[in-house]
Structures are given as structure tokens and as C-alpha cells.
């Protein structure tokens, strides 16, 4: 195990190095507190600030390398989709920062030896992308199927294929854009296979760090950047309220706040929410825009989260609950589970549906 494995623990040769060292994971989690603590830090930091934390100077290369597979075990034991996503994103972001620094000619690499660096070409080969990414005089082109696969989770309109130039079945991309696509490949690699099946012997030894992660998860702000709008997957309560809005029914203030805050939390802009309300006879653009901006924190110091299930029940807005409703306590949690259980190929954001101009 070397320094490059510590910086890029998802690489195949890092995994091979761990196997060649004959590491017994069951012994590590029971006897090596430093590895377990660093693994806990990776996961908790992913939840609290979107990073994997910076290892202390006293953390050895071995500890840093082994903390990665132990972190994946911790994520698997907790077994929450939001944790898998946030952890994989944090690991990918950390790797992105490192390999783009390695590539940059403007970065002082005196402290980064050749044995710790990873090039863009190395990563393309690692993810079997070399045959699908082609050098050009300007930068690169990416085969369309590969581009669609890697860009599928990137929500900015600039990544939509309809907004890209095409060159003989390939998508031209800049160096920076290619690095972003590589970051997505890393994220998929980290998330692949999670949650793992964890033997009871290992899970029992990790009770304390698992409890710490669960505490951090409980404190997680639900107003995360979902930014995917698939009304078919909305919880029954929000489907009902959205149907009422689109039928032109009058909604009391608490119901209007519930659906507006939910739509805001899942990624709709003020303009998009105003467009939805236009069909309602009680619609007033100025007031709707003001209320939505206030909920989103644009005109107030607070960004509001959609009401919890308990609040929805208290106001009589909990309707048609299904089996999943019994297992969650917040409409956003319901939607998150539905998104994670869905097939990415079938999750068409209503904003991307060419034939629809509203989330029916």
C-alpha cells in the first residue's frame, strides 16, 4: 500500500494492494481503532459538510487506505439511500480535487511525487473509457452512449444532449468537462455494490461508529439538492395537493405552503412554481412569487422545508397513505426512496419532457 492508494483508494490497484497484504477486515475493525475512527470521519463528514475530511498528519498510509473499505462497510450497515449518495459524492469530489490538482500545470507539485499522482489518461483507462474518449485539436470528444451514461446525473441544462454540439456521433467536451465526467465515473464506482452484505461479526464490532453516523443522519437537513422532478413518484399527499392546484381548487394556507415548499425542495424554481399555479382561479402572480421566494430563502433568512408527516396529519393533509408511508416520517424521505428505487432510465424529469409543459 502506497501514498497513491491512500489518495485514490477506489482504484483497482489499491484494492489489489489490500488483498495482497492479506488484510483481515474482521481483525481490523476489532483491533485497529485508528482505521475505524478515520472511516467514521469519512462517512460523518460526507453527511455534515460534503467532504471526506482531511486525515491528520499522524494518520499513516495504511490507515488511510484501509479506512476506505471500512467506510463502505459502515455505509452498508446503516443502509440509507441518502447516505450512499452523499458518501459516494464526497469521495468523488475529493478525488476530483486531487486529480485536477495533479493535472494542473499551475499547481506546485513539489510535495506530490510521481508515485502519488494520477493522470487523466490513467483514470480513463481505469474506467474503461479510453476507447470512448477521443483527443481532438481543441480538447476531446466522447461517444454519445458514454456521454449519456456519465452525464445522466448532471442536472445543469448545459449537459443535456439537446444543448450539445455533435460531431459524427460524438460530443465535444473541454478538459474541465471531461474531468467532471470522470468525477461521475468515480462516484458510480464508489456507490457500486452498496449496501454490501456485512457479516454479523463485523457489524457488531462497529456499533459505536454506526451510532455516530445514524445521529448525524438524523440531524441531516432534508432540504438537500434533489433537483429531480418526477411527479409520478411524489408521496400520495403531495400528489393530491398538486392535483388540487391543477384542477383549480382553492387550497387553505397550510396546504398551499405544504405543496409549494415541497416543490421548492425537490428543485423547482420560483418561475416554474408560478407557472403551475397559473391555472388556479385564486392565482395571484405577485403573491405566489413572493410566497415562493420567501419559502426558498430568497427574500427571507430561512429556507423552509416541507412539513413532516406528523404536521401533514395534524392539518388533515395526509391522504391515501400507502405501505411506504408507514416506514417514513417525511414526504421528502418518501420521494427520496422512490427516486433511489427507480430505474434511472425511467426517471424522466418533467422539465425534460418535450411534450409536457407542466408536471401532470
From Swiss-Prot:
Q: What cofactor requirement does the entry state?
A: [4Fe-4S] cluster
Pfam families tied to this protein? DNA_primase_lrg
Under the heading InterPro entries, the entry gives: DNA_primase_lsu_euk/arc, DNA_primase_lsu_PriL
The UniProt keyword set, sorted, is:
4Fe-4S, DNA replication, Iron, Iron-sulfur, Metal-binding, Primosome
Region feature Disordered, mapped onto this chain? 340-360
Q: For this chain's UniProt record, which GO biological process terms are given?
A: DNA replication initiation; DNA replication, synthesis of primer
GO (cellular component) term, any one: primosome complex
Q: Which domain of life is it from?
A: Archaea
Metal-binding among keywords: yes
Q: Which PANTHER family match?
A: DNA PRIMASE LARGE SUBUNIT
Give the family, as the similarity comment puts it. Belongs to the eukaryotic-type primase large subunit family.
Summary of the function given for this chain in its UniProt record = Regulatory subunit of DNA primase, an RNA polymerase that catalyzes the synthesis of short RNA molecules used as primers for DNA polymerase during DNA replication. Stabilizes and modulates the activity of the small subunit, increasing the rate of DNA synthesis, and conferring RNA synthesis capability. The DNA polymerase activity may enable DNA primase to also catalyze primer extension after primer synthesis. May also play a role in DNA repair.
Q: What is this protein called?
A: DNA primase large subunit PriL
State the organism named in the record: Halobacterium salinarum (strain ATCC 700922 / JCM 11081 / NRC-1)
**What's the gene?**
priL
Amino acid at each position: 500500500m502506497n501514498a497513491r492508494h491512500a489518495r485514490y483508494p477506489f482504484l483497482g490497484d489499491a484494492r489489489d494492494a489490500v488483498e495482497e497484504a492479506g488484510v483481515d477486515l474482521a481483525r481490523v475493525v476489532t483491533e485497529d481503532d485508528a482505521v475505524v475512527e478515520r472511516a467514521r470521519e469519512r462517512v460523518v463528514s460526507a453527511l455534515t459538510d460534503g467532504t471526506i475530511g482531511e486525515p491528520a498528519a499522524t494518520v499513516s498510509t495504511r490507515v488511510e487506505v484501509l479506512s476506505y473499505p471500512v467506510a463502505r462497510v459502515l455505509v452498508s450497515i446503516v443502509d440509507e439511500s441518502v447516505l450512499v449518495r452523499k458518501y459516494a459524492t464526497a469521495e468523488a469530489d475529493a478525488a476530483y480535487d486531487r486529480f485536477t490538482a495533479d493535472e494542473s500545470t499551475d499547481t506546485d507539485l513539489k510535495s506530490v511525487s510521481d508515485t502519488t499522482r494520477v493522470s487523466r489518461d490513467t483514470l480513463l483507462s481505469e474506467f474503461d473509457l479510453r476507447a470512448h474518449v477521443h483527443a481532438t485539436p481543441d480538447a476531446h470528444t466522447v461517444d454519445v452512449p458514454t456521454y449519456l451514461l456519465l452525464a445522466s446525473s448532471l442536472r445543469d441544462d448545459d449537459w443535456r444532449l439537446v444543448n450539445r454540439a455533435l460531431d459524427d456521433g460524438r460530443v465535444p467536451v473541454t478538459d474541465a468537462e471531461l474531468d467532471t465526467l470522470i468525477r461521475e465515473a468515480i462516484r458510480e464506482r464508489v456507490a457500486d455494490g452498496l449496501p454490501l452484505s456485512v457479516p454479523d461479526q463485523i457489524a457488531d464490532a462497529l456499533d459505536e461508529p454506526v451510532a455516530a453516523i445514524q445521529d448525524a443522519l438524523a440531524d441531516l437537513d432534508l432540504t438537500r439538492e434533489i433537483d429531480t422532478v418526477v411527479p409520478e413518484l411524489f408521496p400520495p399527499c403531495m400528489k393530491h395537493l398538486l392535483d388540487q392546484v391543477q384542477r383549480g381548487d382553492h387550497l387553505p394556507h397550510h396546504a398551499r405552503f405544504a405543496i409549494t415548499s415541497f416543490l421548492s425542495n425537490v428543485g423547482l424554481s420560483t418561475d416554474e412554481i408560478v407557472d403551475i399555479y397559473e391555472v388556479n382561479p385564486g392565482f395571484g402572480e405577485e403573491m405566489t412569487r413572493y410566497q415562493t421566494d420567501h419559502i426558498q430563502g430568497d427574500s427571507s433568512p430561512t429556507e423552509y422545508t416541507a412539513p413532516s408527516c406528523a404536521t401533514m396529519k395534524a392539518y388533515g393533509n395526509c391522504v391515501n397513505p400507502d405501505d411506504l408511508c408507514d416506514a417514513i416520517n417525511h414526504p421528502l424521505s418518501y420521494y427520496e426512496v422512490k427516486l433511489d428505487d427507480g430505474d434511472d432510465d425511467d426517471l424522466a424529469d418533467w422539465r425534460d419532457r418535450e411534450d409536457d409543459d407542466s408536471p401532470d
